[in-house]
Regions:
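Active-site-proximal beta-strand elements of phosphoester/diester hydrolases
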Residues: 221-224
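The feature captures the ABC ATPase H-loop/switch
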Residues: 119
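Conserved G/P- and acidic residue-centered "switch" motifs that form tight phosphate/ATP-binding loops
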Residues: 116
Length: 255
């Protein structure tokens, strides 16, 4: 095994504490652990506020990029949607930096793995649109996580619905199954797919659950479920991070 490990950037979310007196940029430990243990990478958190002129220099240091989930949805002005209600959480800084990083990564060949909000950002970055509230669409399931003071972490991340993989697509090369069960913790989802993207999986109610960017030379995959949850127990999630890690290592060798 090579002693060189890929440096993998992980997007962060803006968190406000102490009544607005303290703002931090953070990400869940599960993403960090999955990158370190299953992608065999060195995880580096990327704060939301980086100057445009510094993005290219940042990418010279990265061998991969993970786009994490987040409480805030992508603001609709980025895809021509109706404004959010005033109480909807937003993350202006993350929208700005991630939507610029995605096409830059594709152009350079930096591997990208988008999770939950990440798949939505990949779609918006290339001109696609999003549903604001999937559960309000006729014949669609409620994809949001269960809520309540007594809801456990296990219940939040339980396998909720089936997804079907696109025939002869990315997942046919990754695992030996045509379908799989996944967790579901999102209210927003892909509406119109960007022209540059390819659908890799649907949920059983027709919601797009996985995509790829075919023009990327190695790995540019987004999934709507939370693949960072217990990859040590879930073969699909484990395989995704391992394949992403291989692509990141290959990127080092091609620099």
């Amino acid at each position: 095994m090579s002693s060189i490990k890929p440096i993998i950037g992980i997007s962060t979310n803006e968190i406000t504490n102490f009544g607005g007196r303290q703002i931090s940029h953070s990400t869940g430990l599960r993403y960090v652990n999955a990158v370190a243990k299953f992608a065999n990478g060195i995880p580096i958190l990327i704060p939301s506020y980086i100057k445009d002129e510094d993005l290219d220099q940042l990418l010279k240091k990265l061998d991969g990029l993970v786009l994490t989930g987040g409480r805030a949805n992508v603001e609709p002005h980025h895809f021509g949607g109706d404004p959010f209600p005033p109480d909807e959480p937003i993350d202006v800084g993350r929208d700005e930096i991630v939507l610029k990083l995605i096409p830059k990564c594709v152009n350079l060949g930096v591997p990208i793995f988008g999770i939950c909000r990440g798949i939505q950002e990949m779609n918006v970055a290339y001109g696609g649109t999003l549903h604001y509230r999937v559960h309000l669409i006729p014949d669609k399931n409620d994809h949001r996580m269960p809520r309540g003071d007594d809801v456990t972490v296990k219940e939040i991340f339980t396998l909720r619905h089936r997804i079907d993989f696109t025939k002869n697509g990315f997942f046919s090369r990754l695992i030996n199954n045509d379908s799989c069960m996944v967790n579901s913790l999102h209210g927003q989802a892909i509406d119109s797919l960007a022209q540059n993207l390819k659908i890799e999986a649907y949920s059983d109610d027709g919601v797009i659950e996985a995509i790829s960017i075919p023009e990327h030379p190695s790995f540019a995959v987004g999934v709507q479920w939370h693949a960072e949850y217990e990859p040590e127990k879930n073969e699909l999630n484990k395989s995704l991070f391992m394949e992403f890690g291989k692509a990141c290592l290959n990127y080092i060798n091609k620099k």
